[in-house]
Design a protein with these regions (language model features):
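Charged/polar positions within long, soluble alpha-helices
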Residues: 166, 332, 358-365, 394-401, ...
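Extended amphipathic alpha-helical segments enriched in small hydrophobics
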Residues: 311-369
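Generic structural signal for well-ordered, non-transmembrane alpha-helical segments
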Residues: 54, 58, 152-155, 195, ...
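FAD-binding core of flavoproteins
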Residues: 163-312, 484-526
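Glycine-rich flavin
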Residues: 79-211, 216-240
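Acidic/polar, glycine-rich intrinsically disordered N-terminal extensions of enzymes
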Residues: 1-78
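Short, charged, amphipathic alpha-helical segments
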Residues: 343-347, 375-383
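Alpha-helix capping/hinge segments and adjacent helical runs
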Residues: 380-524
Length: 527
């Protein structure tokens, strides 16, 4: 995605193909833009070819191809609302009804299944924010036209956008605007835009995106140069990415797709995102200089919280679908499928699956009124997802390990072992499963489960789910604040008061209940 394609120029483009979603090949080509990505001390020449990123990039490309596949049109396409006559992924179209919300859910789930739930920052994730910018554009004044333009670009073109909102864990005891040597801040204003420097961390999958949204979350700011929210193209001069160790590359070096079927293609690299005197064009700026507004872009009427948690709940439900299916297979392979304790643990995993699908459906079927006749996923169900999502994967991991034990480890090291004549008879005999399952059946199933619960990839994914909606403590404390802000707390207090008003020291205050004066021993003893 060229730095020349900004939302303002893109909105006025007349060429039909400039305002439609990319194909998979076009997405891959858009990554060959000279971006500055560093891994293991070397600059990556082409992320689409490098073994640390190439299959994960192709996993994203498959999403774009699915969008263009006529077989998926009923689920993955809906007309745009921008007037360009095109189509878009349903989640980029602000919903007006329950039917719209259910269409969003189906589309999110379809893409999530293509990732088995293990890529959380797919292109539709950022529809959670940009999908509402047209409706909530006035919040971004004096940059409201930029917000509208970004909404149109995202809906019509569906570029892949990461976000970087977390400050490096440096000098956490100081206000953010007192850490100017590290945190994102504006150094200068020019006719061309803002000159920005600083860093953000855990910019998930940013090496493979077209743009990065940069925002601020945290305590209120005092210095206006830190109050900045914007979107920047990944090929912009001054944008630098330092990638963490690649699980995809490790899988390629030490195994095969049979051995690492998830990490080898679904590794969202959580990178360090650095701006080194980068120029942010004015048309890409959403907030600047307003110390109060800079921390509110995700709140108020933005709809972002409801929408991204709806996306997250649906994706997590898909992930647990896979885990539950693998567990049903694994315990049968182990021959323990009729053991009561094992059944209880597998049943609990299915219960988590049912919980998150129920929360996702509740968000869709009970939407809250929004702006201009639009609706949002139900807020109370969204908040419930926020709390329970941080608990689910640690508990599911424990349930899998408790049920399968050493079966998760009792595996040969590489797919090549099965192609080695001296080993194959031994593997077929000693690694076979129960109930007619072959050694290959057993090893294939348990290797995927090991990737989910025991590998480095697994550890990252568990931490991802625990941190997905922010601090676990914040999720719980803010639930009280949200209840107070929405009137729920008053309603709950009122209900408790009404329940207690049904009786007092003299007994029942409800006339059709009988006081126990005729049978109460204490009352008789005092007479």
């Amino acid at each position: 995605m060229s730095t020349n394609e900004n939302p303002s120029s893109a909105v006025t483009a007349s060429a039909a193909n400039s305002r439609r979603p990319m194909t998979g090949d076009e997405y891959l080509e858009s990554l060959r833009d000279g971006r500055e990505v560093w891994l293991n001390g070397e600059r990556v020449k082409d992320v689409t070819l490098h073994p640390a990123f190439r299959n994960s990039a192709r996993s994203i490309a498959r999403l774009y191809d699915a969008l263009w596949d006529e077989a998926n049109a009923d689920v993955l396409r809906t007309p745009t609302t921008t007037g360009n006559g095109g189509f878009t992924h349903p989640f980029f179209r602000p919903a007006r009804s329950v039917d719209d919300m259910l269409a969003d859910q189906k589309a999110i789930a379809h893409w999530a299944r293509m990732m088995h739930g293990f890529m959380g920052r797919t292109p539709d994730y950022k529809a959670g924010l940009y999908g509402g910018m047209e409706i909530n554009a006035d919040f971004f004044a004096p940059f409201e036209d930029n917000a509208r333009a970004w909404h149109r670009l995202m809906q019509e073109r569906i570029p892949y956008v990461a976000h970087a909102i977390v400050n490096p864990p440096v000098d956490r005891n100081l206000p953010a605007d007192e850490v100017g040597d590290v945190f994102i801040h504006v150094e200068n204003e020019t006719d061309n835009g803002l000159v920005v420097s600083g860093a953000k961390v855990v910019a998930t999958n940013v090496p493979l995106t077209n743009y990065c949204f940069v925002g601020y979350v945290g305590a209120p700011l005092k210095k206006r140069e830190f109050a900045v929210v914007f979107t920047v193209p990944m090929d912009a001069p001054g944008v630098k990415v330092i990638a963490r160790a690649s699980y995809e590359q490790a899988a390629a070096m030490h195994g095969s797709p049979f051995d690492y079927p998830l990490a080898s293609r679904l590794d969202e690299n959580d990178a360090i995102f650095i701006l080194d005197h980068a120029v942010i064009p004015w048309e890409n700026v959403l907030v600047y200089g307003d110390t109060e507004k800079a921390g509110q872009w995700a709140g108020g009427n933005s709809g972002q919280a409801n929408r991204i948690w709806f996306h997250g709940a649906t994706r997590l439900a898909v992930k647990i679908d896979l885990i539950a299916g693998l567990m049903l297979k694994a315990v049968r392979i182990n021959g323990t499928d009729n053991f009561r304790g094992v059944q209880a643990r597998v049943g609990e995993i299915i219960g988590y699956r049912n919980l998150f699908w129920s929360l996702s459906s509740a968000m869709a079927r009970n939407p809250n009124p929004w702006l201009d006749g639009h609706v949002l996923p139900d807020f109370e169900a969204s908040v419930a997802y926020r709390i329970f999502s941080s608990q689910a994967m640690p508990q599911i991991r424990n349930l899998v390990e408790s049920s399968l034990g050493s079966a998760l480890i009792y595996l040969n090291g590489h797919a090549k072992d099965f192609k080695t004549p001296e080993l194959r008879p031994l593997l077929d005999r000693y690694l076979r499963g129960s109930n007619g399952n072959t050694a290959i059946d057993r090893v294939k199933t348990l290797k995927m489960l090991w990737e989910i619960v025991g590998s480095e990839f697994a550890g990252r994914n568990e931490l991802y789910e625990r941190s997905y909606t922010g601090s676990e403590e914040d999720a719980r404390v803010q639930t009280i604040w949200m209840a107070e802000a929405t009137g729920l707390a008053d309603s709950l207090n009122g209900y408790a008061e009404s329940a207690m008003a049904e009786y007092d020291l003299d007994g029942w205050k409800i006339p059709d209940f009988t006081n126990p004066d005729d049978v109460a021993r204490l009352a008789r003893d005092n007479d």
